């Protein structure tokens, strides 16, 4: 396998997807208050054999306020990544997993997540801000 980049995504798939709106009253309440919902992202990885890594990218769209009535939306998206043999430095590996892989998979992940939100009765939802994973990484590093 020849890699022109420092990594290759061997597979990507939805590991878990969830939409929860308990009842019609909650749905009506959420429909009026969906603008308060926030998108949160978490990225975890675990090593597999043969320089492969499983990267789990989780998106949650949720209300941070303490309302009793709320909907909950979550997706866990997995990428199986083969890292080039030359990558030895932990920092380089972090950049690959937290920035490069994310930038590559995000269009599919975002589309799948938006489909979930739209099909859950919220067709007006748009994720206005594109996530800049490189910028996020730089902020966390400082």
Where are these predicted regions, by residue range?
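N-terminal intrinsically disordered, cationic/polar leader segments
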Residues: 1-142
């Amino acid at each position: 396998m020849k890699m022109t980049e420092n990594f290759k995504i061997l597979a990507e798939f939805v590991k878990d997807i969830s939409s929860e709106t308990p009842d019609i009253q909650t749905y009506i309440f959420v429909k009026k208050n969906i603008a308060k919902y926030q998108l949160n992202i978490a990225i975890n990885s675990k090593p597999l054999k043969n320089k492969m890594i499983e990267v789990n990218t989780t998106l949650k769209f949720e209300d941070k306020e303490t309302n009793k009535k709320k909907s909950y939306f979550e997706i866990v998206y997995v990428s199986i990544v083969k890292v080039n043999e030359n990558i030895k430095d932990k920092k380089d590996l972090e950049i690959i997993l937290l920035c490069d892989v994310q930038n590559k998979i995000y269009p599919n992940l975002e589309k799948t997540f938006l489909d979930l939100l739209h099909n859950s009765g919220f067709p007006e939802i748009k994720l206005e801000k594109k996530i800049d994973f490189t910028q996020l990484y730089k902020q966390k590093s400082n």
